[in-house]
Amino acid sequence: MTDKAPQKTHLNIVIIGHVDSGKSTTTGHLIYKCGGFDPRALEKVEAAAAQLGKSSFKFAWILDKLKAERERGITIDISLWKFQTNRFTITIIDAPGHRDFIKNMITGTSQADVALLVVSAATGEFEAGVSRNGQTREHALLAYTMGVKQLIVCVNKMDLTDPPYSHKRFDEVVRNVMVYLKKIGYNPATIPFVPVSGWTGENISSPSQKMGWFKGWKVKRKDGFTKGQSLLEVLDALVPPVRPANKPLRLPLQDVYKIGGIGTVPVGKIETGILKPGMTISFAPSGFSAEVKSIEMHHEPLQMAFPGFNIGFNVKNIAVKSLKRGNVAGNSKSDPPTEASSFTAQVIILNHPGFIKAGYSPVIDCHTAHITCQFAELQEKIDRRTGKKLEDNPGLLKSGDAAIITLKPIKPFCVERFFDYPPLGRFAARDLKQTVAVGVVKSVEHKAGAAARRQVQKPVLVK
């Protein structure tokens, strides 16, 4: 392979939504229609699904590689699949919908360029998904927090509305979802709403005869409007993300594997910079350094990996147990990542039943890391719209408040200023099985021995 990036732009799409909204089935059908599956493999899966009485999960089953997942009927970890459209090479991240698996869902979102929110139009199912405890709301909020600017809404299970393929029901679902997405911060005019049936395949790759009333989706872009009919047309109309290849390397690890005959293979998505075989890289917060022997993406060797690539790479002389999910890899010779002893952030409290005081210690989800951090100091309460200071050293914070706070990680943690490396500088704070706050990192105090770098960033306006 040459040192040039492949001609088709890479896009990472995370599939989000409430459990049983039909995410895996819709995704599986989409990949199937785009030729991403071997027909013979599909026949085997169909036979196995029929044997277990799960024929209705056929396309979802294609995505459920793990045996444990098949038996439990829930997508647990994040599955990665690849297919081609006319314009893009798309990697699908199929994220779990069960509340218990929200941590995996956050990890998937942090890797994505685009979120495809699947909502069920089936009677009762939509209402459950958007209820206060449903995941539709939380997933959409997390996607926005993690910086996923492009969102597609797939109104699924149109074959199960009353009557089937109901125009009225589609409009009702769209109206409800639009209100919530606007509250989060998305502009509904930029979001395509597409009616589909993941099970029958209606309107996935070509316009549906059963939904003649659907005149197509239309979205606003900087250069005018874009429109189309099917879900596949939406994917081809996406705006390619700007990839910061000229910044130093930052690669948060998603997992680390030991592969027989090869050795230690960390995997993850390059957020910034470029990775090449022969490069010496450092991992933070673990502190280890190693040489990159080889790089692979979708089982193909690469001589250069660019931002947005989901890759696996082999490193020399480093044990699997020395690295783990949440470590960040960087070029040892160019602004390598380091462990944070504390960091200052601008946060918005979204959902806490009481008051938050100094000492509060939620789990912070940032890039692929999940680390408990203490709200060590509440520095100032600010106006969430203007960023102006309202109060110094507030005694407590409640839902709706915005503040500048200092956080101290309980375990080793690598974060960056949002200004320098956005994907490593935005986070969600979780407690009580829900997202209690979201924030952006303004400055980082690096652990003794790490180079003291960078000045404090100006307040970031969070809408």
Swiss-Prot record:
An example of a GO molecular function for this protein is: GTPase activity
Keywords, comma-separated and alphabetical: Cytoplasm, Elongation factor, GTP-binding, Nucleotide-binding, Protein biosynthesis
Where are the stretches annotated G4? 156-159
Under the heading Pfam families, the entry gives: GTP-eEF1A_C, GTP_EFTU, GTP_EFTU_D2
In residue numbers, the region (G1) covers: 17-24
Instruction: Share an example GO biological-process annotation for this protein.
Output: translation
> Keyword GTP-binding: yes or no?
yes
A GO CC annotation recorded here is: cytosol
Which named protein is this? Elongation factor 1-alpha
Q: Which organism is it from?
A: Xenopus laevis
